[in-house]
């Protein structure tokens, strides 16, 4: 009887080990990937931007703002996309943020959190973005069962806990300096997208301090509109290489700005 138990036990143990091995990647896959986008609303009064129409450049009005509620603003563009579903909006997690939107990808277990910062609070928007890039102050955001990818309640990792962080808006570092940079820890694996004018020059030092890697940023003047951001995110979701993601971003920018693909490739770059 003892001999039989040993012989039968071996396959049982093997089966259990095999099932455990399968369960580990499945459990990892069940955790949603998150993207946190920090948007500084365009503001004719408080930012050194080329003035735009008064309605588009009102930094206190996210609904009609150039970088948020307009056709190519982050909220409107993603809400109209066939790839994303807006599952929550209107939240104001802190005073500087006039609106928070949460989007769920329709086919992948990926969520996007987008925060619209009051135009006059652009410095805070940039500091919060850099802190997130450094992995600091992670935020937990609960998602209701009816709006989650799994059909059950889940919690999203945002800010310093997000998998990818992005900034979109005016390059405020052209107007002011930061007294200190958020410091990342060794082994920081965050990637960052910075859609702002000449961001590779102005954000280089603070981004190095965070330890994050620049996935897409810019070498010249640009329109930080959402089509470029979405195209880069599309590639990131598919686990494409940094160069492939940058190529997507450049192609999208050329499509809308008609600047020529060669010019878009010079403008939008990846890495240091």
Q: Language-model segments: what does each one mean?
A:
Residues 2-14:
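Bacterial N-terminal signal peptides that target proteins for export
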Residues 25-30:
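Boundary at the C-terminal end of the N-terminal hydrophobic targeting segment
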Residues 216, 236-245:
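A polyampholytic, Gly/Pro-enriched intrinsically disordered region
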Residues 155-235:
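Catalytic cores of nucleophile-dependent amide-cleaving enzymes
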Residues 31-61, 106-112:
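Acidic/histidine-rich, surface-exposed loop or edge segments in extracytoplasmic proteins
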Residues 62-158:
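Functional beta-strand-loop-alpha-helix junction segments that form "active/interaction loops"
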Residues 244-272:
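Caspase-like cysteine protease fold
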Residues 12-23:
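Bacterial N-terminal signal peptides
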């Amino acid at each position: 009887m003892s001999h039989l138990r040993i012989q039968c036990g071996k396959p049982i143990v093997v089966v259990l080990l095999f099932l455990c091995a399968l369960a580990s990647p499945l459990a990892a896959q069940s955790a949603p990937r998150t993207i946190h986008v920090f948007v500084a609303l365009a503001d004719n009064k408080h930012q050194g931007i080329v003035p735009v129409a008064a309605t588009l450049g009102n930094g206190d009005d996210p609904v009609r703002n150039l970088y948020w509620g307009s056709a190519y603003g982050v909220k409107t563009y993603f809400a109209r996309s066939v790839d994303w579903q807006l599952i929550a909006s209107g939240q104001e997690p802190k005073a500087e943020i006039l609106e928070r939107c949460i989007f769920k990808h329709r086919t992948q277990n990926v969520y996007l959190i987008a925060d619209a910062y009051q135009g006059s609070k652009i410095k805070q928007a940039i500091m919060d973005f850099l802190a997130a890039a450094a992995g600091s102050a992670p935020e937990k955001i609960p998602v209701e069962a009816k709006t989650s990818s799994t059909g059950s309640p889940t919690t999203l990792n945002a800010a310093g806990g997000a998998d990818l962080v992005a900034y979109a808006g005016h390059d405020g570092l052209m107007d002011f300096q930061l007294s200190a940079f958020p410091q990342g820890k060794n082994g920081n694996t965050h990637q960052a997208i910075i859609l702002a004018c000449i961001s590779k020059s102005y954000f280089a030092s603070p981004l190095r301090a965070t330890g994050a890697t620049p996935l897409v940023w810019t070498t010249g003047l640009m329109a930080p509109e959402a089509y470029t951001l979405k195209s880069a995110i599309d590639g990131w979701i598919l686990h494409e290489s940094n160069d492939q993601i940058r190529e997507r971003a450049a192609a999208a920018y050329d499509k809308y700005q008609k600047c020529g693909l060669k010019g878009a490739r010079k403008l939008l770059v990846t890495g240091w």
